[in-house]
């Protein structure tokens, strides 16, 4: 029998041992947390930069508004596969070091290459964040680095299971303009043509002008956000998601995509036909009442239809065999984690240091560059209100929502020589999205949608009006009533004269923005359309004379 003193000593010793164990456990937990923070933090920053870049497009362009749900769906797909991912991570390396064999070395080489490519991507993105090629580059780098890390951490089996959920974010990146523009025009024209036929069967007279439909009460503008392109992209996203959600085979997934596209096109034709009938019966202004509800209805109907179709395709399918259960692979997972963590920790901290250096360097570069840029003259546009033929043309709500300018106006008038004029003026105050929104639409994209044919242009002419350098790009479009001449100026505050280069939107000249600044000092767009003029030279001379009257320079 132990004495009270012995019992007291044993109890005190037990308490000291417990405190030491708890202290050691707390220290290990802190080290474990610091280790994984160092590994995960650079990838969290990469994904934040990608979503932050794309969020401007998602918020300002209805065509890509579905992008907001894509990151959520990516996380949902990963959570759905969580148990199989844990089992795959414990069995994927088979006890070997991640760098054993050529495959591991290739992955590490790809990891280093993608990390190095982040430097030019981030530098160019600072000047032209709206450039689709840069958005895709940032997307591939983010996805590629994440997949490389998953392979090194968990092995090839886990990489295979994570491949689709991680790559699914690419569906939310805007398509390159060279692909997007012709697809938009083609799908919208097909939709409009089908609607015209349906209206004729219903006894409603209608005429197609490019992407526009003219009925007896006016012209219906079927803009890009309401075209088949939006329906196609949304249906593609939904089809791919349900194919992965139900873990379908390749054939079923390939069948689901065109089936979704056909369903989306049919629903979009129904929507356009409904809006056209409303316009013919109640007037074009009545469309605003049904525009958004009709769009929401076809999106919900498309989602429900594809969900049902995916469930039908998956009916009676035998699930594919899974991986080891988490319990069976737990011991192997502990052994492999000891081999992976040192490598992942080194790569994670190296990547974190590299990303911080690149982003800090890019910010310092642009701040230093912009500190030497002059703000430029303050000018605005005053329309010829004293002309008896002048009238203010209201700006549609869709245009306001799409361009989101701070100041905008448009007007039309007839000059003394009989030429017809129409002018648009938009102003964006200094800010992050000023350059982004000002560069969005150009005449060669918008006017063909209204049935005009581009005959020539763009041709750059630098016009000096009251000591203000205006980079005018001229176009000639063919119409049923003869050619029209379009002059568009996108003026950027603080930009030097040599910053205005011909074919500014081309993929190579956009790199010049690295030396021109980020375009955050404000943007102005002035567009002038002239009709009933015989020659381009005559139109250019008339614009030069008219600009002297329209442009007003404020005293500084």
Please provide the spans of the model-predicted regions.
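Hydrophobic N-terminal alpha-helices or hydrophobic patches in metabolic proteins across all domains
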Residues: 2-556
């Amino acid at each position: 029998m132990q004495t009270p003193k012995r019992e007291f000593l044993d109890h005190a010793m037990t308490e000291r041992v417990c405190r030491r164990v708890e202290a050691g456990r707390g220290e290990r937990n802190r080290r474990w947390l610091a280790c994984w923070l160092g590994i995960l933090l650079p990838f969290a920053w990469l994904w934040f930069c990608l979503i932050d870049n794309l969020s401007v497009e998602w918020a300002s362009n209805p065509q890509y508004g579905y992008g907001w749900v894509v990151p959520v769906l990516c996380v949902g797909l990963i959570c759905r596969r969580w148990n199989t991912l844990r089992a795959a991570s414990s069995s994927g390396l088979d006890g070997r070091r991640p760098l054993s064999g050529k495959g591991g070395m290739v992955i590490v080489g790809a990891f280093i290459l993608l990390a190095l490519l982040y430097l030019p991507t981030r530098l160019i993105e600072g000047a032209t964040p709206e450039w689709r090629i840069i958005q895709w580059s940032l997307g591939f780098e983010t996805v590629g680095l994440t997949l490389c890390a998953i392979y090194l951490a968990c092995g090839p089996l886990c990489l295979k299971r994570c491949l689709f959920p991680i790559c699914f974010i690419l569906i939310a990146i805007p398509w390159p303009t060279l692909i997007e523009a012709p697809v938009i025009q083609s799908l919208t024209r097909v939709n409009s043509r089908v609607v015209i036929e349906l209206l004729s069967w219903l006894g409603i007279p209608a005429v197609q002008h490019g992407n526009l439909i003219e009925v007896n009460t006016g012209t219906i503008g079927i803009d890009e956000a309401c075209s088949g392109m939006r329906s196609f992209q949304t249906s593609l996203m939904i089809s791919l998601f349900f194919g992965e959600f139900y873990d379908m085979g390749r054939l079923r997934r390939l069948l689901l995509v065109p089936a979704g596209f056909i369903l989306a096109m049919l629903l979009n034709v129904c929507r356009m036909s409904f809006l056209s009938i409303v316009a013919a019966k109640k007037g074009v202004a009545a469309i605003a009442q049904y525009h958004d509800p009709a769009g929401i209805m076809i999106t919900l109907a498309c989602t429900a239809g594809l969900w049902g179709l995916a469930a039908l395709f998956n009916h009676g399918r035998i699930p594919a065999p899974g991986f080891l259960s988490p319990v069976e692979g737990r011991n192997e997972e502990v052994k492999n984690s000891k081999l992976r963590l040192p490598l992942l920790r080194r790569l994670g901290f190296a990547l974190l240091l590299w990303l911080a250096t690149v982003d800090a360097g890019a910010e310092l570069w642009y701040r230093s560059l912009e500190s030497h840029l002059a703000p430029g003259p303050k000018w605005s546009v005053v329309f010829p209100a004293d002309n008896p033929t002048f009238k203010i043309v209201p700006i549609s709500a869709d245009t306001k929502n799409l361009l989101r300018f701070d100041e905008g106006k448009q007007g039309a008038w007839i000059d003394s020589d009989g030429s017809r004029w129409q002018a648009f003026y938009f102003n964006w105050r200094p800010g992050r999205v000023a350059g982004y929104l000002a560069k969005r639409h150009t005449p060669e994209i918008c006017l063909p949608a209204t049935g005009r044919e581009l005959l020539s242009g763009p041709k750059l002419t630098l016009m000096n009006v009251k000591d203000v350098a205006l980079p005018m790009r001229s176009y000639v479009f063919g119409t049923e009533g003869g050619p029209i001449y379009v002059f568009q100026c996108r003026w950027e505050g603080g930009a030097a004269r040599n910053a205005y280069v011909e074919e500014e939107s081309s993929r190579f000249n956009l790199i010049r923005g690295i030396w021109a600044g980020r375009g955050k000092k404000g943007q102005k767009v002035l567009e002038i359309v002239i009709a009933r003029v015989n020659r381009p030279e005559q139109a250019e001379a008339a614009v030069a004379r008219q600009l002297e009257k329209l442009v007003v320079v404020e005293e500084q």
